[in-house]
């Protein structure tokens, strides 16, 4: 019986190495489970003791299913099961109505069209937009508000003028985003703080940004 087990072509069944970069974590998990089942069926099933089967199973798990791969597969599985937050992509008039309701039309002398134009050229109307700068700071939300001064990414010794976490600026209801944007426009630069507004919106006819929108 021992000699028969030694002749079992276990290695030939699993010709693809586990470390292959083209195989994902979940696929490796499936390969691990199928390899164990195949090897056990080749060993003769009922002619092998339960203790022997268990020992072989443990050996196969150690050989073909390293702990790191098992953990990766588990993380992938959990990420599929847990609910994910959906990014909110606003329409032009939809965003104009929301910003109008928050009181941005005419705030600090800027029209509603200024704000809609700004949102388009900073984030493309994406409330969950997140961009990383070379210095490690982040631009957050529909107005791409930066973490160097206005919000907190838990980086020590960094101002947090808006007194909120940067993740709050990714909320699709835009309340925190509008509060922070109002504080920014209270600065001497106003909307000029945003380079996108200076290049694409300032001094231009912006009526098209709110044209046809009902409030």
Curated annotation (Swiss-Prot):
Cytoplasmic compartment spans: 1-63
PTM comment: The processed form derives from the membrane form by proteolytic processing.
CDD domains listed in its UniProt record: LYZ_C
Keyword Disulfide bond annotated: yes
Location within or outside the cell: Cytoplasmic vesicle, Secretory vesicle, Acrosome membrane
Keywords: Cytoplasmic vesicle, Disulfide bond, Membrane, Signal-anchor, Transmembrane, Transmembrane helix
Topological type in the membrane: Single-pass type II membrane protein
Alphabetized SUPFAM superfamilies for the sequence: Lysozyme-like
Domain C-type lysozyme: 88-215
Pfam families: Lys
A GO biological process held by the record: fusion of sperm to egg plasma membrane involved in single fertilization
SMART domains noted in UniProt: LYZ1
Site (Cleavage): 87-88
Nuclease recorded as keyword: no
Main location: membrane
Disulfide bonds: 93-213, 117-201, 151-166, 162-180
Molecular function via GO: lysozyme activity
Transmembrane segments: 64-84
Subunit text: Interacts with ASTL.
Purpose: Sperm surface membrane protein that may be involved in sperm-egg plasma membrane adhesion and fusion during fertilization. It could be a potential receptor for the egg oligosaccharide residue N-acetylglucosamine, which is present in the extracellular matrix over the egg plasma membrane. The processed form has no detectable bacteriolytic activity in vitro.
Family to which the UniProt record says this protein belongs: Belongs to the glycosyl hydrolase 22 family.
Record's protein name: Sperm acrosome membrane-associated protein 3
UniProt lineage: Eukaryota, Metazoa, Chordata, Craniata, Vertebrata
